[in-house]
């Protein structure tokens, strides 16, 4: 996520009043272990909400798409279903070992929901 200083005034902030991923903070920064991959990335998409509406356009030329991240039960599922809705015939995969949910139960529920929507979960 990328949120502004006004996060708590947003709809998300009112329903999830936990300031996180505020632009310019340590919690917003890319983890050091992932920084080399960002430098090689063709695109880095910032998203102010659960789903990245720019993601389908950025992924247009790919036949297979793998998603990982936090939180499985919020952002990962939102983006997996968003991309699957745009590209129902593309192979969309989520690597469960590279994801984590708010709770183990909500993580498992999100993975099950994605499987039901024809997102491959490994």
Model-derived features with residue positions:
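Active-site-adjacent betaalpha module
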Residues: 4-122
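Short, solvent-exposed turn/loop segments enriched in Gly/Ser/Thr/Pro and often Arg
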Residues: 1
